[in-house]
Structures are given as C-alpha cells and as structure tokens.
Amino acid sequence: MRSDMIKKGLERTPHRALLKGTGVPQSEMDKPFIGVATSFTDLIPGHVGMRDLERFIEKGIHTGGGYAFFFGIPGVCDGISMGHKGMHYSLPTRELIADMVESVAEAHRLDGLVLLTNCDKITPGMLMAAARLDIPCIVVTAGPMMSGRGEAGRKYSFVTDTFEAMARYKAGVIDEKELKVCEDNACPGMGSCQGLFTANTMAILTETLGMSLPRCGTALAVSALKRRIAFASGERIVDLVRNNVTPRSILTRAAFENAIRVDLALGGSSNTVLHLLAIAHEAGVELPLETFDILAKETPQLASMNPAGEYFMEDLDAAGGVAGVLMQLGDKIKDNPTVMGMTTLQLAASIANVDEAVIHPLTDPVKKEGGIAILFGNLAPKGAVVKQSGVSEAMMKFIGTARCFNSEEAAMAALMDGNIKAGDLVVIRYEGPKGGPGMREMLAPTAALMGLGLGDSVALITDGRFSGGTRGPCIGHISPEAAEGGPIALVEDGDRIELDIPDRRLELLVDEQTLSERRARWQAPEPKIKTGWLARYAKVVTSAYTGAVMSAD
C-alpha cells in the first residue's frame, strides 16, 4: 500500500509517532489509509449538510476495513459570488481544489480518496485531482435541493426565479411583495440549486463517467438514500484500493463520450464543456472541443429540465435518474467500467421502468439535437458555446447591432437603465480566463434580458461564460478571448453580427480591411487585477477552448 511509506519500517518511527498523536491505534496501522476530501462549509446550501454525510462515509470506510482521515477543501458558491468581484475567484478555485487534493494525498501517501463535493467548480476540481493522482477514488456529490414552494403550489427555482425577479421588479411586472415571496421561498433548505444547473449537471456526469455510485447524481440532499450512498461509497473505496482500481481505468474516451451524450440529452449547463475538457486533460484523454458538436448532431434532447423546461431534479430522480437516461439513449452509449464494479450498460439495464413524460424515448425527443452547440466563424475562430436547449426558435437565427461593453457591470447598468433595445446584440468582453480574470459567469445580465422581456429580440455574446441557469440566445466561451487580441476585441458599437445556431456560425459582418486596421490599432489593456492569486492565475491560464486549464510551461 502507498501508506506503507509513512507507517512501515524503522525509518518511519517518527511518522508513526505523529500518527499515534492523532489517535490512530497500533491495531489500525495495517489498514488502508483513506482520505476524505470534504468541502463542507455553512456558507453554501449545497454543502451545509455535509457533516452528516461525512459521518456515513467514515462509518462505511471503517466497515469496509479502512481507516479514515478528513481534510478540508474550499467551497465557493457561484450564486453568492455572482455579479461582483467574488465571481473572479470561482473558476480559478477549480484549479486550487485539484492542487490541494493532490498535495494532501501525495504528502501523506494516502491509499485512496473519497471526494465529498457538490457545487459548481468543486466537483470538476475533485475529478481533475482524481485523474491526475490516479489512485483509487470515489466521488460523493451531496445532492440537489428540493424545489421551492410558493402560493397555490407554485414551484420555485432559485437560479431562474430570483435572478429574473430582479429585472421583472425593475420593469414593474411584479411588486415588492411578490419579490419577497420569491426570495423567501426559492431555497427551502440544503442541497445544490434545484434545476439542471452546473452543480447538478456535473453530479449527473460524475455518475455517468463511472466515478460515483448509482443514484448518487440525482438522490436529493435531504434523502435517506443519499446517506446510504455515502456509507456505501466509504465501504466501496476500500475495495477499490485492495483491487487497485484507479480513475484512469474508468475515465476513458468512451466514458467522456457517454458523459457528453447524457449532458446533451438532458440539456445541461454549458459550463460542462469547460470542465469535461479539463478533466480529460488530466486523464490524458484527447477530447477536442468539436466532439461536443459532433455528438450533439446525433444525440437528441430527451428531457425538458429547468431552467429552460418544467422539470426539477426531484422529477428526474423519480423518473429513473442517470440509469434511466442511459437506458433511453440505448446503443448510443458505450460500455465502460465504473467504481461500482458494474459497467455502464449493466447500469442502464438495471432499471425496470422510466417515466417517459420526463425522460423521453429516442423516438419521441424533446428536440432533434442535443442541448449544446459549438459555433465557429470570424468572431470565434477557435469556437464558442451556446446552450441551444434554452434558445427559442425565434432566436436560432439572428442579426443584431453590436452594443459593446468591457465588463459585466457596464452591460448590467445599460440593461437596468433601459438602454438595450430590441435588435441589439450585447457584446461583453475582457471577461475571459485571462481578461476577467477568471471567466466570470454572466448570469445577472442574461437573467435581466429574460426578465425584461428581451429574450426573443436581443442576443448576448461574451468571452466569459454563463451560469447553468442561463437561458436565451447567449453565446459564451468565445475564443480567442479579447485579452489575447481575439476578434471580439475588435467589435465596435453599430457593427452588425450574425448568429446562426443551426449552421453553427457566429460572424462579424465587417470587411477584412476594416478589421485589419482595427487590429493594428488594438492594444492590450492593463490587467484588472495585479496582485494576489488571481494575478498569478491570469499569467498561466489557457483559453476556454482547452478547458481553461493552467499551463505547466
């Protein structure tokens, strides 16, 4: 065992003394040492219930014959950090988390890891660490929140309803009482945000990849099932250590293709493009950005999930969960091993019934194509991402007049002041991985567009990214980004921009001579943040089309 390096032999007498100083009995020294990387914090609804899950994981580890050690990992809530300086830190924490898990596991020669996670960047950070370390690992996602409840049984979604309510109140569509009812009822308790936003999409994809136990991706945070899954995960990690089942034997090209197909079938968050690219990078799996679009054209959308649709995570779980989606996708899914021991196809075959009102069959899809599309053109030579499942038919093709803003705040002010009109195309730039830095989510302006009733007449493009709660004609991840001199930096107010999602094009309708003249005049702006972690991050982070991973060069 790896842990023998810190507990066996004469030379390790000081190491054993330190371990005994923590309370480890001599009788436990021959057992596998299992680290539990926990992202508990009482700052985030998605993580506030983890203390309970920690207990069940620990019980499972000891039942399985291992010895558990806990260590902490930071958790940032994208909702709380949204719309201000805090959002600069969200995506970079993914890299910090991967580095921290790696550091603790390697420094203490842990035999295996249980990765307790839930929210947006924490789950991919944990998976990146698992792929990088390639020691036995199992992921426990803490589970989604129940939908909120309002008057007359109305269901509330935190992300969609609260952010859009701000603009609706500003526009006079709702009054202060309705706003307060939404605020008070949108989050009824612990768990990740209720729809198919980034956290829940990543939990589902973690199960699809084979890195968590069946039902883990959809079992509600408040459920007894989630606790049983936590216990079983603790027990299972000891078996994985004894049999040396490591993440890279599970995270194959087939696993990533399966995850992309499930994402497309459910209409998941566009952030998953960044995260799957980054996890594949750590696993040594070649996964070009174009793969998402190739699979989207042959994988129909099978579910209508909130925010663009009517169903919540509780509905998906009851309808069959991940296994139900795999079953409905049929021969589009490739067989692959999982941490459970059963293969992906065995998991799909394990479910008896699927509620086809929620998870449609291939013969009756919600939409003919998957939920995400990759666009290219002279405005995005290396690609851009759109969650096409959230775009109305009226906006699948659009030509608009550019309104340029060099920050999210400037665009948000223009929206809330009523300065954006039908036919405009909002351009938010210098918000990419380097330029932001941190590639902030543009949920506030996209929610304002919808709340102001502009979702069928105004589009938005950015080198930043979007929340899983974003819906509407919003194109992100434009690469190269403005801070690297990408074409989005050359757009001027009044330019015409063509968006054609069916044809996968994003074009700036300006002649090449004019663009060459603008390019010659362009100068990179001063960094927005010059000190601290983010200043270092901006120097080494790569482009969105590579997953915004940090360069080792």
UniProtKB/Swiss-Prot annotation:
Pfam families, per database record: ILV_EDD_C, ILVD_EDD_N
Catalyzed reactions per annotation: (2R)-2,3-dihydroxy-3-methylbutanoate = 3-methyl-2-oxobutanoate + H2O; (2R,3R)-2,3-dihydroxy-3-methylpentanoate = (S)-3-methyl-2-oxopentanoate + H2O
Transmembrane segments: none
Catalytic class of the enzyme: lyase
Binding residues annotated for [2Fe-2S] cluster, in chain numbering: C119, C193
Keyword Lyase: yes
Gene3D superfamilies the UniProt entry points to: IlvD/EDD C-terminal domain-like (3.50.30.80)
Modified-residue entries (N6-carboxylysine), positions: K121
SUPFAM superfamilies cross-referenced by the UniProt entry: IlvD/EDD N-terminal domain-like, LeuD/IlvD-like
GO terms for cellular component: cytosol
Pathway given in the UniProt record: Amino-acid biosynthesis; L-isoleucine biosynthesis; L-isoleucine from 2-oxobutanoate: step 3/4; Amino-acid biosynthesis; L-valine biosynthesis; L-valine from pyruvate: step 3/4
Signal peptide per UniProt: none
Catalytic activity, EC: 4.2.1.9
Keywords, comma-separated and alphabetical: 2Fe-2S, Amino-acid biosynthesis, Branched-chain amino acid biosynthesis, Iron, Iron-sulfur, Lyase, Magnesium, Metal-binding
InterPro entries per record: Dihydro-acid_dehy_C (IPR042096), DihydroxyA_deHydtase (IPR004404), DiOHA_6PGluconate_deHydtase_CS (IPR020558), ILV_EDD_C (IPR056740), ILV_EDD_N (IPR000581), IlvD/EDD_N (IPR037237)
Residues of the active site: S467
Cofactor info, note text: Binds 1 [2Fe-2S] cluster per subunit. This cluster acts as a Lewis acid cofactor.
Binding site for Mg(2+): D78, D120, K121, E441
CC cofactor: [2Fe-2S] cluster; Mg(2+)
UniProt key word Hydrolase: no
Gene Ontology MF terms: 2 iron, 2 sulfur cluster binding; dihydroxy-acid dehydratase activity; magnesium ion binding
Biological process, per Gene Ontology: isoleucine biosynthetic process; L-valine biosynthetic process
Record function comment: Functions in the biosynthesis of branched-chain amino acids. Catalyzes the dehydration of (2R,3R)-2,3-dihydroxy-3-methylpentanoate (2,3-dihydroxy-3-methylvalerate) into 2-oxo-3-methylpentanoate (2-oxo-3-methylvalerate) and of (2R)-2,3-dihydroxy-3-methylbutanoate (2,3-dihydroxyisovalerate) into 2-oxo-3-methylbutanoate (2-oxoisovalerate), the penultimate precursor to L-isoleucine and L-valine, respectively.
Record-stated family: Belongs to the IlvD/Edd family.
Known partners and oligomeric status: Homodimer.
The name this protein goes by in its record: Dihydroxy-acid dehydratase
Gene name, Swiss-Prot/TrEMBL: ilvD
